[in-house]
UniProtKB/Swiss-Prot annotation:
Modification Phosphoserine, positions: S118
GO biological process, one term: cell population proliferation
Record's GO cellular component terms: centrosome; extracellular region; ficolin-1-rich granule lumen; midbody; mitotic spindle pole; nucleus; tertiary granule lumen; ubiquitin ligase complex
Any coiled-coil regions, as ranges: none
Compartments in which it is found: Nucleus; Cytoplasm, Cytoskeleton, Microtubule organizing center, Centrosome; Cytoplasm, Cytoskeleton, Spindle pole; Midbody
UniProt-annotated binding residues for Zn(2+): C17, C20, C73, C76
Full protein name: Protein yippee-like 5
Record flagged with keyword Nucleus: yes
Species for this entry: Homo sapiens
Subunit: Identified in the CTLH complex that contains GID4, RANBP9 and/or RANBP10, MKLN1, MAEA, RMND5A (or alternatively its paralog RMND5B), GID8, ARMC8, WDR26 and YPEL5. Within this complex, MAEA, RMND5A (or alternatively its paralog RMND5B), GID8, WDR26, and RANBP9 and/or RANBP10 form the catalytic core, while GID4, MKLN1, ARMC8 and YPEL5 have ancillary roles. Interacts with RANBP9 and RANBP10.
Family, similarity comment: Belongs to the yippee family.
GO molecular function, one term: metal ion binding
């Protein structure tokens, strides 16, 4: 196996894999905390990095039928949640391309503030 290249999304509040601490996303990408996964509470994010994706699966969920892929950590292969590929109901289309991370499988921590130098420095 070759080298694994990981991305870093930056931000002041970071979400990382609970198993290996690989950075996945930040607080500014959070859309909703009102989701439920197999392990309990789950969060919907706009952009998540450092993921591996399973094959597409047809699942019937509480909100209807969806085409989804399970997502796991690119670094350690731990399951983290899923990504919505397609929603059959118009009211659920906002989820398409968005990622669910299960709260029990990720860790939230302090990130860092990026200071961009000004012309006066």
């Amino acid at each position: 196996m070759g080298r694994i290249f990981l991305d870093h999304i930056g931000g002041t509040r970071l979400f990382s894999c609970a198993n290996c601490d690989t950075i996945l996303t930040n607080r500014s990408e959070l859309i909703s905390t009102r989701f439920t996964g197999a392990t309990g509470r789950a969060f919907l994010f706009n952009k998540v990095v450092n993921l591996q994706y399973s094959e597409v699966q047809d699942r019937v969920m509480l909100t209807g039928r969806h085409m989804v892929r399970d997502v796991s950590c690119k670094n350690c292969n731990s399951k983290l949640g899923w990504i919505y590929e397609f929603a059959t109901e118009d009211s659920q289309r906002y989820k398409e391309g968005r990622v669910i991370l299960e709260r029990a499988l990720v860790r939230e921590s302090e990130g860092f503030e990026e200071h961009v130098p000004s012309d006066n420095s």
